[in-house]
């Protein structure tokens, strides 16, 4: 601006969208299990359709292969229609671990012998799937060495609060994989 005052600004913006065009791995039985046609590092998970409400609900649902289930456990959709919920029912979901958009902006100010520069940056359209101890504050077992977050303890499915749409599934006494699967829940 003048000999004593200097101001400058800067910014950046990048956009990146990718898709796997070729993969020499053998094709999967179901097209949605293949990497070709999807972005690199595409997250895959099970589609949650709520929580089991009763033993009758469990008996009338496809078999889940991630351990025995009880009322209050996450209920998953049978994508391939074979009556069994397993790794073949995982579908692409969400953004990948590679951001589509990166951005930044900054400003520099100098007045006499005083200098100040600030830069801000960010990324968006990026995803991460979390589960297990990242959600519950422990491995989900009430016998583990960790503690549950208060949020989980107060908003989970219980026999006294049998809400099939509870924010969190039931808690369990020991290692249990069904409720820790990567999913839309």
Residue ranges and their predicted role:
Residues 92-93, 103-106:
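Generic recognition of flexible, low-complexity loop/linker segments
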Residues 7-11, 105, 111, 116-118:
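Transmembrane beta-strands of outer-membrane beta-barrel proteins
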Residues 121-124, 129-136:
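Short Gly/aromatic-enriched secondary-structure transition segments
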Residues 175-185:
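Short, intrinsically disordered, charge-balanced linker/junction segments flanking boundaries
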Residues 2-97, 135-137, 144-177:
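Conserved small-residue
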Residues 13-19, 111-113, 122-126:
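Transmembrane beta-strands of outer-membrane beta-barrel pores
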């Amino acid at each position: 601006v003048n000999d004593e005052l200097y101001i400058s600004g800067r910014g950046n913006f990048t956009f990146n969208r990718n898709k796997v065009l070729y993969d020499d791995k053998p094709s999967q039985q179901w097209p949605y299990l293949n990497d070709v046609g999807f972005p690199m590092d595409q997250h895959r998970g099970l589609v949650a359709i709520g929580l089991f409400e009763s033993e009758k609900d469990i008996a009338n649902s496809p078999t889940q292969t991630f351990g025995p289930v009880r009322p209050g456990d996450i209920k998953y959709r049978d994508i391939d229609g074979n009556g069994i919920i397993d790794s073949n029912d995982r579908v692409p979901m969400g953004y990948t671990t590679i951001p589509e958009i990166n951005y930044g902006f900054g400003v520099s100010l100098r007045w006499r012998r005083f200098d100040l520069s600030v830069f801000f940056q960010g990324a968006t359209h990026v995803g991460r799937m979390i589960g297990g101890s990242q959600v519950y504050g422990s491995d989900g077992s009430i016998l583990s060495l960790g503690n549950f977050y208060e949020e989980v303890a107060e908003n989970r499915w219980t026999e006294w609060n049998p809400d099939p749409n509870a924010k969190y599934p039931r808690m369990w006494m020991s290692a249990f994989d069904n409720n820790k699967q990567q999913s839309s829940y």
